[in-house]
Design a protein with these regions (language model features):
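RNA-binding accessory domains that recognize and position tRNA/RNA substrates
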Residues: 1-183, 193-239, 308, 356-361, ...
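Generic beta-strand/beta-sheet core signal
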Residues: 9, 164-166, 209-211, 244-247, ...
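Active-site adenylate/phosphate-handling loop in enzymes that bind or generate adenylated species
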Residues: 129-134, 167-179, 246, 250-251, ...
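General small-molecule cofactor/ligand-binding pocket signal
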Residues: 144, 242-244, 315
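Conserved G/P- and acidic residue-centered "switch" motifs that form tight phosphate/ATP-binding loops
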Residues: 189
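A conserved beta-strand->alpha-helix junction
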Residues: 229-255, 343-346
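A short alpha-helix-loop-beta-strand transition element characteristic
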Residues: 334-342
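The feature marks non-catalytic terminal segments
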Residues: 341-392
Length: 392
């Protein structure tokens, strides 16, 4: 019986110094939590590699492998097989385990690595030996050390030897939660889910905040954003989305403020509310999907005016990206199809005909001074709805 196993290679974590252990602990916590939703597995970490083994016949290794490709902090994910550290047994395992790969390929080579230096063969000798055995077992697959279709990987480690084909790229980045907490403004568009994904990839646990303007925006629009957040849990892990009632604020802005400043004042309210939610949850930053010059409210002057109301750093991972680059990532992470569903969001409500694109901060402050800002912010925060989400 083949000893099926998944090998996970750490990414940036291996470059860490004294705090590396805390990053590894966060990674292991995230991996085990993801595996718990699938079945029973044994997961442990040795020499910068995480090992996942099935506990019994009900352990779904295919599902576990797929889930691990979405865990931040991993450079590669390898479906492998293990055996004792004996050259003949390693060759026999390779012949058996890689049968389909060898039959499909026209050429191959072997690469061996030994972290256990007590193994009696050098890495080159082991690769040559196993390669010879594979060539004899599969004579139609030629040896090509320069440009092979298939590379057979052999790893001799402290506990056992492992054989696998080409590794699957991991999600990269750093373990979610290793670099603190931030709130992320999540609309129903293409950009904000991508910005959320990109900051999560840097090890940040995220609290999505959505501004809901019923009846100007529909219940379907809210459910669309909740679905986007649920899709993001594949990468971000469990999240609680904060749905903020925004109708009264927008109506007050429309009734009392200069139309040219509607969008700017609305965005400033969003930042104030995001700051309140961040403070209540220990978050240290606000994430937005803004992209320089994409729309009228995303000029440098407009963004400076918007960000002036918060003390927290505002993270804008999309700031220099082209729209097509953003769409490519949205398709990759599975949010694009939901993002383009035809439901409006609060940013389309009461849109000014001639928005200010180069506002002066003093002008914006004067325009919004007719509002009871603190009362409106407190009312919105008190009325927010929390929806807990996890990957299903």
């Amino acid at each position: 019986m083949i000893n099926d196993i998944i090998l996970l290679k750490q990414g940036e974590i291996v470059l860490k110094g004294l705090n590396r252990r805390s990053f590894e602990q966060k990674l292991m916590s995230n991996i085990k939590r993801r595996l718990e939703a699938i079945g029973k597995f044994k997961a442990y970490c040795l020499q910068s590699t995480v090992y996942i083994e099935p506990v019994d016949e009900t352990s779904d290794m295919d599902a576990a492998f797929e889930a691990m490709t979405k865990v931040f902090g991993l450079a590669s994910v390898n479906r492998a097989a293990g055996c004792e550290k004996d050259a003949k047994k390693i060759a026999e395992l390779a012949i058996d385990y890689l049968r389909e790969d060898m039959l499909a390929a026209k050429s191959f080579k072997c690469e061996a690595k030994r972290s256990d230096k007590s193994f009696p063969m050098t890495s080159i000798e082991l690769a040559q030996f196993v390669g010879g055995e594979l060539s004899e077992a599969y004579p139609d697959c030629e040896v090509d050390v320069h440009d092979p279709e298939l590379t057979v990987h052999i790893e001799v480690r402290d506990l056992a030897a492992y054989v696998h084909a080409a590794p699957t790229p991991g999600a990269g980045g750093m373990p979610v939660g290793a670099n603190g907490v931030a709130v992320t403004l999540l609309s129903g568009g293409i950009d904000s889910p991508v910005s959320t994904y990109m900051i999560a990839k840097r090890g940040v646990r995220l609290i999505p905040v959505h501004f809901f303007s019923f009846p100007y925006t529909s219940e379907q629009a809210k459910q669309k954003v909740i679905e986007l957040a649920r899709e993001l849990t594949v990468y971000c892990g469990r999240m609680t989305i904060e749905v903020v009632p925004f109708t009264h604020i927008q109506e007050e802005i429309r009734a009392k403020c200069d139309e040219d400043y509607f969008t700017l004042i609305m965005r400033r309210f969003m930042m104030r509310i995001a700051q309140k939610i961040a403070d209540a949850n220990g978050a240290k930053a606000i994430v937005t999907g803004e992209n320089l010059g994409q729309v009228a409210s995303q000029t440098m002057e407009a963004m400076a005016s918007t960000q002036a109301v918060t003390e927290l750093p505002v993270l804008q991972p999309l700031i220099g990206m082209d729209k097509e680059e953003i769409i490519t990532i949205a398709r990759k992470i599975g949010t694009f199809d939901t993002s383009i569903l035809p439901y409006e969001d609060c940013c389309t409500v009461f849109t000014p005909k001639h928005p200010r694109t180069r506002p002066k901060l003093s002008e914006v402050e004067r325009a919004e001074s007719v509002l009871d800002i603190d009362a409106l912010v407190d009312e919105a925060v008190k009325g927010l709805e929390e929806v807990e989400l996890r990957h299903e």
